[in-house]
UniProtKB/Swiss-Prot annotation:
Residues annotated with Phosphothreonine modification: T242
Function of the molecule: Inhibits endothelial cell migration (in vitro). May be involved in G protein-linked signaling.
Organism: Mus musculus
Record's subunit section: Interacts with GLUT1 (C-terminus), ACTN1, KIF1B, MYO6 and PLEKHG5. Interacts with RGS19 C-terminus. Interacts with SDC4/syndecan-4 and SEMA4C/semaphorin-4C.
Gly residues compositional bias, start-end: 27-39, 228-240
Gene that encodes it: Gipc1
Family label: Belongs to the GIPC family.
Name used for this protein in its record: PDZ domain-containing protein GIPC1
Domain PDZ: 133-213
Tissue: Widely expressed.
Subcellular location: Cytoplasm; Membrane
A biological process term (GO) from this entry: endothelial cell migration
């Protein structure tokens, strides 16, 4: 963003007396540049103008989920930068931020901040709380865990299947960050790597999970939830547009996804959980984006290998993704 004279004075990062869910009708994409007149224009001759939407000037309101004043954050293009801005506003180490939810302070995995933020969304940051170590006997092949990650190096539990091995261990809850398995640190690992490690643990053996739960306010200390059913709540922002965060490249302001895209993303996310034990709406959205204009499964497989080769998706999974996108296109929900 260009700097210049005559800009409005920047608001302080913390706003003590603001309501928790304020109206922000003044949010917009960018501001007029401070330079004007022919002299300024002549001095810039020959230089290409900066891309207008490279870093859209959007201000979001945020609180710590366990309770805090309201903060204002702006100027981030990915999740890692977002966590840094939140940490700066609340004078915390960035490593303390575990994940964020949109428009609720509760550990609600259906409101988890992923790759998109509605322009009117209110961000609640969940920070590290109590650490715990739990021994688990793997009596069945499937533990009943669905893993996701925050895009910044922390993998955590998004869902616990009812009646599963993990469901019977009350110390383990949705929202717990998985720090280590049998002493092996998982900090910096992606969700699919953690899910694979859990799957490869031998049946009939005991293993140790080192976990960190989100810090809780008094009104949040209650019986743990197994997480909502996929698609049981709004997955994307409710504002007039959405800020799309990418792990590579700049953030962009986009229209809300179409009904086809929203349903396709939901179906692909379900397939990720079924095949790989993870949920990741940003990954699902990327796969839908790659596949919506492809003519056959082979073209989709080629696009996925080129962009997402690290995941090594099996052929049957790619075929099911192709089918899910096709079903959503023709309205077979």
């Amino acid at each position: 963003m260009p700097l210049g004279l005559g800009r409005r004075k920047k608001a302080p990062p913390l706003v003590e007396n603001e309501e928790a869910e304020p109206s922000r009708s003044g949010l917009g994409v960018g501001e007029p540049g401070p330079l004007g007149g022919s002299a300024a224009g002549e001095s810039q001759m020959g230089l290409p103008p900066p891309p207008a939407a490279l870093r859209p000037r959007l201000v979001f309101h945020t609180q710590l989920a366990h309770g805090s004043p309201t903060g204002r954050i702006e100027g981030f293009t990915n999740v890692k930068e977002l966590y840094g801005k939140i940490a700066e506003a609340f004078r915390l180490p960035a490593a303390e931020v575990m994940f964020c939810t949109l428009n609720t302070h509760k550990v609600d995995m259906d409101k988890l901040l992923g790759g998109q933020i509605g322009l009117e969304d209110f961000i609640f940051a969940h920070v590290k709380g109590q650490r715990k170590e739990v021994e688990v006997f793997k009596s069945e092949e499937a533990l009943g865990l669905t893993i996701t990650d925050n895009g910044a190096g922390y993998a955590f539990i998004k869902r616990i299947k009812e009646g599963s091995v993990i469901d019977h261990i009350q110390l383990i809850s949705v929202g717990d960050m998985i720090e280590a398995i049998n002493g092996q640190s998982l900090l910096g690992c992606r969700h699919y790597e953690v899910a694979r490690l859990l799957k490869e643990l031998p049946r009939g053996r005991t293993f140790t999970l080192k976990l960190t739960e989100p810090r809780k306010a008094f009104d949040m200390i209650s019986q743990r939830s197994a997480g909502g059913h996929p698609g049981s709540g709004p997955q994307l922002g409710t504002g007039r547009g959405t800020l799309r965060l990418r792990s590579r490249g700049p953030a962009t302001v986009e229209d809300l996804p179409s009904a086809f895209e929203e349903k396709a993303i939901e179906k692909v996310d379900d397939l990720l959980e079924s095949y790989m034990g993870i949920r990741d709406t940003e990954l699902a959205a990327t796969m839908v984006e790659l596949g919506k204009d492809k003519r056959n499964p082979d073209e989709l497989a080629e696009a996925l290998d080129e962009r997402l080769g690290d995941f090594a998706f099996p052929d049957e999974f790619v075929f099911d993704v192709w089918g899910a996108i096709g079903d959503a296109k023709v309205g077979r929900y």
